[in-house]
Amino acid sequence: MALWGGRFTQAADQRFKQFNDSLRFDYRLAEQDIVGSVAWSKALVTVGVLTADEQRQLEEALNVLLEEVRANPQQILQSDAEDIHSWVEGKLIDKVGQLGKKLHTGRSRNDQVATDLKLWCKETVRELLTANRQLQSALVETAQANQDAVMPGYTHLQRAQPVTFAHWCLAYVEMLARDESRLQDTLKRLDVSPLGCGALAGTAYEIDREQLAGWLGFTSATRNSLDSVSDRDHVLELLSDAAIGMVHLSRFAEDLIFFNSGEAGFVELSDRVTSGSSLMPQKKNPDALELIRGKCGRVQGALTGMMMTLKGLPLAYNKDMQEDKEGLFDALDTWLDCLHMAALVLDGIQVKRLRCQDAAQQGYANATELADYLVAKGVPFREAHHIVGEAVVEAIRQGKPLEALPLADLQKFSRVIGDDVYPILSLQSCLDKRAAKGGVSPQQVAQAIDDARARLAL
């Protein structure tokens, strides 16, 4: 059933209908459309369009339809309705007859779909927040179990300074906490109801839109009808949140792919999140992580595509806006799936402590400690930096770590170096000295874990 037709003397070309119809994807808004329709029926009572008995009949029929949709949402796709609004109205008329045709009084599909999408976004944001916090919790638990797992930290993919696997986990907790904050901020801005704004100029019925917003669970009603039906900022914000969040998950995946590689060998992934090769029987491939990394691109594409769709649109509603849903649905589905998969990867991960420690002791990751030692002895840092560089060259020539060079060899580069240098060059000393807030010292890492556990109520 089309919701328009009196103006037209010819039927739509079937090819145009297929091109124009959106039911194949906006069917996901069925529950929201029904909930919004129940609220709208109540509003129509307040302005005398419906009697209380008529509203009761409509609400009862809509609630029955809601249960039918929840039991089998795929039934919607068997219809040739133009969109979810047409489908809901058609089903309502099937149930209550002519009375169902009164429901759309004073309402446009423009404010209707804007309301439906915001309701869907609110529910989805709550799911994303839950999944985000579950992944933060998994990272904190993994950090708790691996506080003593010393490993090399990297810059430019070169071994730089020793850190711990726990400190690495907590870095991603921080990223996810920012993602959580962005979602909460987005939720505040989208939590305003456009229902009652009509096609663009507002409704001709004196409906209390603030009351209507409250019935739907919004904090308030929007202030300008033109903006309300054309606003898709919340779509852009959520896509931006997803794009940033997926970048974080992609980096997480890339790190673990490297840590899991034969070249690093710092971790082993569970059989539950890996796959094999059809040719090479020895392979154990990190497919879950590679897919997280790969799916990042489609989310970035959804954001870029939506920005390009909106950039040239005049006020108010244009059919271009129908393109807001597929990219949004796919991007947020993808983000949610990847959050869950990242937590599953952590659930069975094994950290190979000895291999991590061996790697941390290689690559002269304690060179900065020697420079700091010289500074403490009164050598200017820039000069100390040069001295240590020369000492590293000598250690490489001898095929030894810095701490294995004889004192006499070290003193060739600076006479201030004494026997007290060797404890300074140990891995534990490297960690212990990073005791400022946010550092990698055991005390700071333990405090960061405690703080995260308190924030997440673990």
UniProtKB/Swiss-Prot annotation:
Pathway assignment: Amino-acid biosynthesis; L-arginine biosynthesis; L-arginine from L-ornithine and carbamoyl phosphate: step 3/3
Keywords: Amino-acid biosynthesis, Arginine biosynthesis, Cytoplasm, Lyase
Record-level GO BP terms: arginine biosynthetic process via ornithine; L-arginine biosynthetic process
Database matches in Gene3D superfamilies: Fumarase/aspartase (C-terminal domain), Fumarase/aspartase (Central domain), Fumarase/aspartase (N-terminal domain)
KW Lyase (keyword) present: yes
Keyword NAD in record: no
Cellular compartment(s): Cytoplasm
Reaction it catalyzes: 2-(N(omega)-L-arginino)succinate = fumarate + L-arginine
EC code: 4.3.2.1
MF term (GO), any: argininosuccinate lyase activity
UniProt family annotation: Belongs to the lyase 1 family. Argininosuccinate lyase subfamily.
Protein name, as recorded: Argininosuccinate lyase
The organism of origin for this protein: Salmonella schwarzengrund (strain CVM19633)
